From Swiss-Prot:
Protein name: Phosphoribosylformylglycinamidine synthase subunit PurL
Pathway: Purine metabolism; IMP biosynthesis via de novo pathway; 5-amino-1-(5-phospho-D-ribosyl)imidazole from N(2)-formyl-N(1)-(5-phospho-D-ribosyl)glycinamide: step 1/2
Binding site for ATP: Y43, K82, D481, G518
Any single GO BP term: 'de novo' IMP biosynthetic process
CDD domains: PurL_repeat1, PurL_repeat2
The keyword Protein transport belongs to this UniProt entry's keyword annotation: no
Chain positions recorded as Mg(2+) 2 binding sites: D108, D259
Reaction equations catalysed: N(2)-formyl-N(1)-(5-phospho-beta-D-ribosyl)glycinamide + L-glutamine + ATP + H2O = 2-formamido-N(1)-(5-O-phospho-beta-D-ribosyl)acetamidine + L-glutamate + ADP + phosphate + H(+)
Domain of life: Bacteria
């Protein structure tokens, strides 16, 4: 029998288990506690930090604690969304790790009764010069494309960053968004004693056993031995499961639905019973098994994919079975909901484990972390480049700025025919069939900023996500997050985690955007490297009328280019990192009051229908944002930028709370009025014209290129980096 230490439990945790059970646990029970009390399932390091996040609001139907968050968008419609990580599995088996990450997050959405309509992925990899990184990159992208394309859910947005700190630990965060009717939402709460517990979907095998525990430890040289802990997905089975579950959920007698993800039956059964303050009894002999001779330990801990747990009134069992039979899926009653508060596991009628449900879900000892502030070395002495045009082209072609088109072209981003604004803009926009409304979705986080200052970096991540939505004409209505950090046992990492959560909370609270779901992924480090603190923000926004939809592409010859939020800085940025190799300094400052008013100006102008295009300023600064809008619109721009700081930082600095919009000349007075009403400065910096990309600084021309030249650099560089 494995010891508690072999399973990742501490001596203190084992003593707590004995106290809760009033006896020593047997092997099956010990395995159940090991997965449920793993960091991945229990959040034992972060529970107390996450309590400070703003999770309520007038639109919030369901916050954290369910399969996904739910936000009301009116007309009896809700958005259901969540983000999760699949970092450790993707580091070991990138194709299946990423693919099953997609499968798991999609199940969280339709478990709530919502039809999945969009996927997003936020990815981080190491230096592309490494053969290992190229292997991981190729496998992850292929896994996402394979699974997402096969299930018919479009991958519409996301982000990819490269940095050496992610070489051993790629970050694979996936987000799914669904739409449902408000009165058809289902919850994972078993509140009816005597109800049948049905396992539906695929058969159970030995794949993924202890996957949750594996995801809660540092990677090492021995991690490759844990490839069996990586689940294997079948997207065609998932597609059948989506349709069957959405049909079954409409039955009155289906009371609760729970995805089987991390920790398999152990997690699904204990959580669905615990939320309803009930007990649950199952017999593993009734679980459809695809492998012979599986032990109770293996069955109850298996993380085989494409499985769901349904709580059903007994008289509706046959109706549910008929639906799943029609979709060629297994459906089997494996147990009942009880009043005793216990999770009883039997095998052929004999009890093999019996544990209080809340002991598994709520009684894990919280880990008290030690905190130590990392000392920032201050601003660097940045040289000034001689040739700003060459510098611009080098920056535009760099891994973190060049287009991701070669990646998103592999994803079917149009399936479902809802995608209105395609990948490549600030955010994706999807129509809602049968409604005049639309939704915008995005993911954002600059890990470099968070490394330099986790508090300010996390605030910036929230603010930039909101700016991206506003640029499409959307009002931000909800956040999901994925907190990716190294080992919290390191006081400096614990400090980063604490400050990042505080920064997220402040920005979300100030901008009045509730955080309704999320995920924590810790221990993303190896002996050689720790990842940057990477609190990824997923955000959804509501566009009240499809006539308000805006994108980043320049459109009309002669339109004025207007900068909203006229400020510049000489802070650390992608320019200082890429061009000069400086990976330290002070992050760009952000004033949340200014940020809020800049967003209000842009959104009001879009709703007044005077804006032809809108674009957020982020990595690469003003020059890169202008280039992106020119490339997207296939039309040139002539700009003259005026500022009292160095020319390179005028072009490439990343001061926050700035956006560029294009308008017709006759609409400038109205835009000025909107800006004045919000006490925000604006400045006409140029006009849309011809096929040239020309930028002057204080009257001196510093960039003069053809649109075709910058398009070639922008669109082809990533593929060159991958293939060289």
């Amino acid at each position: 029998m494995l010891s508690h230490r072999d399973l990742g439990l501490t001596d203190k945790e084992y003593e707590k288990i004995v106290e809760l059970l009033h006896r020593e646990p047997n092997e099956v029970e010990l395995g159940m506690f090991s997965v449920m009390w793993s960091e991945h399932c229990s959040y034992k390091h972060t529970k107390h930090l996450l309590r400070d996040l703003p999770t309520s609001g007038e639109r919030v139907i369901q916050g954290p604690g369910e399969n996904a968050g739910v936000v009301d968008i009116g007309d009896n419609l809700v958005i259901v969304f969540k983000m999760e990580s699949h970092n450790h599995p993707s580091a070991i088996e990138p194709f299946q790790g990423a693919a099953t990450g997609i499968g798991g997050i999609v199940r969280d959405i339709f478990a709530m009764g919502a039809r999945p309509i969009a996927l997003l992925d936020s990815l981080r990899f190491g230096d592309l010069k490494s053969a290992k990184v190229k292997y991981l990159f190729s496998g992850v992208v292929s896994g996402i494309a394979h699974y997402g394309n096969c299930i018919g859910v479009p991958t519409v947005a996301g982000e990819i960053y490269f940095d050496d700190c992610y070489t051993d630990n790629p970050i694979v965060n996936v987000m799914c968004v669904g739409i449902a009717k408000k009165d058809e939402i289902k919850f994972a709460r078993a509140q009816f004693s005597g109800a049948s517990v049905m396992l539906v979907g695929a058969m159970t095998g030995r794949d993924g056993i202890h996957g949750a525990s594996f995801a809660s430890e540092n990677l090492s040289e021995k991690s490759q031995e844990k490839r069996p802990s990586v689940q294997v997905g079948d997207p065609f089975m998932e597609k059948l499961l989506i349709e069957a579950c959405l049909e079954a959920i409409k039955i009155e007698g289906v009371l609760a639905v729970q995805d089987l993800g991390a920790a398999g039956l152990t997690s699904a059964c204990s959580e669905i019973a615990s939320r309803g303050n009930k007990g649950i009894e199952i017999d593993l002999a009734f679980v459809p098994q695809r492998e012979k001779g599986m032990t109770p330990y293996e069955i109850v801990l298996s993380e085989s994919q494409e499985r769901m747990l349904l709580v059903v009134k007994p008289e509706y069992e046959d109706e549910v079975k008929q639906i799943f039979q029609r979709w060629d899926l297994y459906s089997q009653k494996i147990g009942v909901i009880t009043d005793d508060g216990l999770f009883t596991v039997k095998m052929n009628g004999k009890i093999v484990a019996q544990v209080p449900t809340k002991a598994l879900t709520e009684k894990v000892p919280v880990v008290e972390m030690s905190f130590e502030k990392r000392v920032n070395s201050g601003n660097a002495d940045v040289p000034e480049p001689e040739n700003l045009q060459e510098t611009f082209l080098k920056l535009l072609s760099s891994e973190n700025i060049c287009s991701r088109r070669s990646v998103y072209e592999r994803y079917d981003h149009r399936v479902g025919i809802n995608t209105v604004v395609l990948p490549g803009s600030d955010a994706a926009v999807l129509r809602i069939k049968g409604s005049s409304k639309a939704i915008a979705v995005t993911t954002d986080c600059n890990g470099f900023y968070c490394f330099l200052d986790p508090y300010e970096g996390a605030k910036i991540a929230v603010a930039e996500a909101a700016r991206n939505l506003v640029a499409t004409g959307a009002m931000p209505v909800g956040i999901t997050d994925c907190l990716n950090f190294a080992s919290p046992d390191d006081p400096k990492v614990a400090y980063q985690l604490k400050r990042a959560v505080e920064g997220m909370a402040e920005a979300a609270r100030f901008l009045r955007i509730p955080i309704v779901s999320g995920n924590v992924s810790l221990y993303n480090e190896s002996k050689k490297r720790k990842i940057y603190p990477t609190p990824v923000i997923g955000m959804v926004g509501l566009i009240e009328d499809i006539s308000y939809i805006c994108d980043a592409a320049f459109k009309n010859e002669g339109d004025l280019v207007v900068l909203i939020g006229e400020n510049f800085s000489e802070s650390a940025c992608e320019y200082t990192k890429v061009i000069w190799g400086i990976d330290y300094g002070k992050v760009p400052s952000i004033d949340l009051e200014v940020e809020k008013r800049v967003q209000q100006v842009c959104l009001k102008a879009i709703r007044e229908k005077i804006v032809s295009s809108a674009h957020d300023l982020s990595e690469g600064g003003l020059a890169v944002s202008l280039a992106e809008s020119s490339i997207l619109g296939n039309i040139g721009v002539i700009c003259d930028l005026r500022a009292n700081i160095r020319r390179d930082f005028v072009l490439f600095g990343e001061q926050q709370s700035r956006m560029i919009v294009t308008i017709k000349k006759e609409n400038l007075p109205l835009l000025k009025k909107i800006a004045e009403d919000n006490n925000i400065s604006i400045c006409v910096i140029g006009r849309v014209a011809g096929k040239k990309f020309i930028i002057s600084v204080n009257g001196e021309k510093v960039i003069d290129l053809n649109i075709d030249e910058i398009r070639e650099v922008y669109y082809t560089s990533l593929e060159k980096w991958v293939n060289e």
